[in-house]
Regions:
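Active-site residues of response regulator receiver
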Residues: 59, 87
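Receiver (REC) domain switch/output surface
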Residues: 116-129
C-alpha cells in the first residue's frame, strides 16, 4: 500500500531537470512528497540512506560518477531503497543495464510527465515492499 507521504532523494546535477521533477510532484494532491535534491553522488552517500528515503531518482551522468558505475555505487550503498534511473536518450543503454542489475525502472528525461513519474514511483515502492516479503 502506498504511503500518503513519500520521501524522495533526487540525485541530479542539472538544477533545471531537478526543478521540473519537483514541479511535477507538486501537482499530486493526495501525496505529500518530501524531496531532498543533491547534485553529486558523493553528496547523496552522506545521507543515512536506509532509514530516510522511500525512493531514489538517480541521474546516471553526474560530475563525480558516470554510467552504470553510478547505479552500482548507489545500489550497493542503498540496497533496500528502490532506485528509478533518470536518463537522457543517449544514456538509454546504461539505463537498461541498470534495470538488469536491480533498478526498479528507468525514465527518459524529456519524455516523463507527472502521471508516468507518479506511476513509476508507486510501482517501484510497491514492488520493493512485495520483494521484501519473499
Amino acid at each position: 500500500m502506498i504511503k500518503s507521504s513519500i520521501k524522495i532523494l533526487i540525485i541530479e546535477d542539472n538544477p533545471g531537470d531537478a526543478r521540473l521533477i519537483q514541479e511535477m510532484l507538486k501537482e499530486v494532491k493526495d501525496i505529500d512528497f518530501e524531496i531532498i535534491h543533491v547534485l553529486r553522488l558523493d553528496e547523496a552517500l552522506k545521507y543515512n540512506l536506509t532509514n530516510n528515503f522511500d525512493v531514489i531518482l538517480l541521474d546516471l551522468c553526474l560530475p563525480d560518477s558516470e554510467g552504470i558505475d553510478t547505479f552500482n555505487i548507489m545500489n550497493y550503498n542503498a540496497p533496500d531503497i528502490p532506485i528509478i534511473v533518470l536518463t537522457g536518450l543517449e544514456d538509454e543503454i546504461f539505463a537498461v543495464s541498470a534495470v538488469g542489475k536491480g533498478a526498479q525502472e528507468y525514465l527518459i528525461k524529456g519524455e516523463v510527465d507527472c502521471k508516468s513519474l507518479l506511476k513509476s514511483i508507486r510501482r517501484s515502492i510497491n514492488h520493493k515492499v512485495i520483494g521484501n516479503l519473499d
